[in-house]
């Protein structure tokens, strides 16, 4: 493993009609045009979504460059396909149900999970951070659990849904939580315990296959990484880079705690669910729950500051401290995706204004 952990980022995007802003089933066309430009896309469960993936990166400058290239290339591919690319975690305006991608596995998922699958159409971002072993990934996952809600608040980008303010900064979180294998991971004492839980979910039918391990943190099935999946897809490249930098430094800090034998916080499922709900509702604009220390409510921005203070040595070690400091100052001035959506909505109550603001931020 490199001197500092490498990272990789995956982002999911929505494809919409350029005129109405409604989701449009063009993923295969967009993937074909993107491939002509040298970018391979992953097709998601619904045919109105695509996913990009960076290569392995050692610096946030590299992550930024790759994300910018991917977003601009896929936006052009979408335009060539008669669609518009949006970095938004739920569609601001939606059909009754989403068409499922024509793929045998996705058809099996739709058959088993019914409207859960057909109402999917949600977009997240996943950050992979290199770790020494799968066992270490699971132990770090246990230590990450208290911080997952505030990371959700940081990236919240799904306030407007079905032509209305949802009342949540991250409505995606509320939709995603309906899946039986989604949400915060349980505390696992070992990789064997993790594997036993996965087997139980498979045997019960709650998962079709191991690709449906949807927990917000998991050891990657394909790479020697821990994958942090809690985020709404951020509105801008800068927001995604900020999230990735904080995640890497948090993992580095928790790896150090693991080496030092520091205690692991035990958090009840109910406390974690309550903290998730509050962060999904308020985002950065309101209250979060401090699960690491007091278990008391505090302003979300203050709790994010507590996390950044905690990981500052790691941020300095990889040269990301100024990036994170400046990124948080920018969020104070401009807001995150959910706040920008609401600002656009409040101007006239017109969904077209939200779509335009999201599209502009996607390529900012």
Swiss-Prot record:
Residues in the signal sequence: none
EC category: ligase
Record has Nucleotide-binding as a keyword: yes
Spans traversing the lipid bilayer: none
Catalytic activity, as annotated: L-cysteine + L-glutamate + ATP = gamma-L-glutamyl-L-cysteine + ADP + phosphate + H(+)
Entry keyword ATP-binding: yes
EC number: 6.3.2.2
Key words of the record: ATP-binding, Ligase, Nucleotide-binding
Disulphide bridges: none
Biological process (GO), any one: modified amino acid biosynthetic process
InterPro entries: GCL_type2/YbdK_subfam, GCS2, Gln_synth/guanido_kin_cat_dom, YbdK
One MF annotation (Gene Ontology) recorded for this entry: ATP binding
Gene3D superfamilies in alphabetical order: 3.30.590.20
Pfam families: GCS2 (PF04107)
Family from the record: Belongs to the glutamate--cysteine ligase type 2 family. YbdK subfamily.
PANTHER family referenced in this protein's UniProt entry, alphabetically: GLUTAMATE--CYSTEINE LIGASE 2-RELATED
Job description of the protein: ATP-dependent carboxylate-amine ligase which exhibits weak glutamate--cysteine ligase activity.
Name by which UniProt lists this protein: Putative glutamate--cysteine ligase 2-2
